[in-house]
Amino acid sequence: MSLVESPPWQALKSKYQELSSLHMRDFFAQDKKRGTRLSLEAAGLYFDYSKNRVDEKTIDLLCESANACNLPLRIEQLFSGKLTNESGEMVGFHTALRQVNNFSFKTNNNAIQEIHASWEKIKKLSIRIREGDYKGFTNKSITDIVNIGIGGSSLGPQMAYNALKPYVKAPLRCHFISNLDDTDFYETVRTLNPETTLFIITSKTFTTKETLENARRATEWLMQAAKKENLIQTHFMAVTAAPEKAHEFGIQKDNIFMLWPWVGGRFSVWSAAGLSLAIAIGWEEFFEFLRGAHAMDTHFRQAEFNKNMPILLALLSIWYINFFHAKTQAIIPYSQRLVYLPDYLTQLHMESLGKSVQLDGSAVHWQTGAVVWGDLGTNSQHSFHQLFLQGTMVIPVDFIAVLKNSRESHWQLPLIANCLGQSQTLMEGYDKEGVMRDLINQGIEHEKAEKLATYRLIRGNNPSNTIILEELNPYSLGSLLALYEHKVYVQSVIWNINPFDQWGVERGKHLAKDILQALQAETDQSSFDSSTERLINYVLKIKGNRP
């Protein structure tokens, strides 16, 4: 029986018909304790999902659908290393990287031992650099760490580093290079000193074009200063699942950190791919980061579905995507330090859930995934919240609020007020009675107020979740990221798709090689479609290679 034929799914269709014409204002008016009942706290996070177009029966039916998809079994498979891809290879075992409390796995003991060894290696290097004992080619201490990677090899560490900057030990600084455009590299290193700069090259396969090209640029940049190749070897580290390729590139074996094949790039910040972060904030704080994620892992494994934060977050997304036909979801963090979180979550969701084939190879017959995007509040209020408030689409929003930036900082009350104000307005709207009252109180005549009111009405009934961190620290950040990882995994289980591959992006990479040869005037262009051929010819014409 397919997903859409299951009894819970059919019941959800009827429930959608029942609720689609109701307004959330009425839910709150009829239930004064709705905000209390539809909220929970776990792993250092507070989650309010009361401003959603659901009642308790909806939640029950969504949970039944999850059970019908064998979610309990699939959760345990995630934590036991029993998930495999179409080739039978283990995937999705990233949760093992943060099992900090008495590793209790009954299988994969070798993986656990390797993780422990990796922890020790990361810890030792972190201490050496932070204490100034790791030297460059002129015997000066390292001050700048440049992470070269792309996708998950860059987005995760960069996002987490920016979020945890108050924990970075001066004078250490981290920088991140990912783009093939050489501007990214040269603008990043322009103010750096080669004598005190360490490059960390992160690539699972160590064949990633963008990463290797930037690594080559790093080599040239260092050689201009050091003159001798043997002098710059201490300025390179590699994180990879292909250590032999890293060694061939010129990385010393002792400077190569393991990235296992069963760790996907977008789930790799917990591994040595987070080396730059571990060095910057120190091993103790990095371990707190792992502990926070582990706390969310434990909650995810143990809590009942209707009290389970990642599961509820996923089921609500399923509700809007598959029944309200939402095509997009927004993430709005109200903290400057979380500026890169929307980009990170965009990749996590869209690369994991952008699939049209089920696990058995058959076609998907229901919508999967959505366009996930966002920006910082309050900046976003002055750019695109207008679409949320008075547009015509259903766009679920996750608001993420931080009460305090750190133990020493002041409460972020103005930010919190704006965040809560947006969620309340999305839910209740601004009806004609309220608009007219406010306009008349401003001294506007009734007839003119009637005309103006039409343009100021806000229908409301737009869904949102609010996630609150008491303080943004390594523990709470780890918990927050694990929350969304598990949310995405639950969605993949219900849709019966593989969240741990991304084959779609490979074809474009292959074609780029052929097109590059054509742009270098080395190959026949007859294999390209007429549009691509015309574009190639236009580029060549501008370059002066064609009349």
From Swiss-Prot:
Coiled coil: none annotated. It is found in: Cytoplasm. It comes from Coxiella burnetii (strain RSA 493 / Nine Mile phase I). GO terms for biological process: gluconeogenesis; glucose 6-phosphate metabolic process; glycolytic process. It catalyses: alpha-D-glucose 6-phosphate = beta-D-fructose 6-phosphate. Belongs to the GPI family. The active site is at 351 (proton donor), 382, 509. Signal peptide: none annotated. This is Glucose-6-phosphate isomerase. Its EC number is 5.3.1.9. GO terms for molecular function: carbohydrate derivative binding; glucose-6-phosphate isomerase activity; monosaccharide binding. GO terms for cellular component: cytosol. Transmembrane segments: none annotated. Pathway: Carbohydrate biosynthesis; gluconeogenesis; Carbohydrate degradation; glycolysis; D-glyceraldehyde 3-phosphate and glycerone phosphate from D-glucose: step 2/4. Its main location: cytoplasm. Catalyzes the reversible isomerization of glucose-6-phosphate to fructose-6-phosphate. Keywords: Cytoplasm, Gluconeogenesis, Glycolysis, Isomerase. InterPro entries: G6P_Isomerase, G6P_Isomerase_C, Phosphoglucose_isomerase_CS, SIS_dom_sf, SIS_PGI_1, SIS_PGI_2. The gene is pgi.
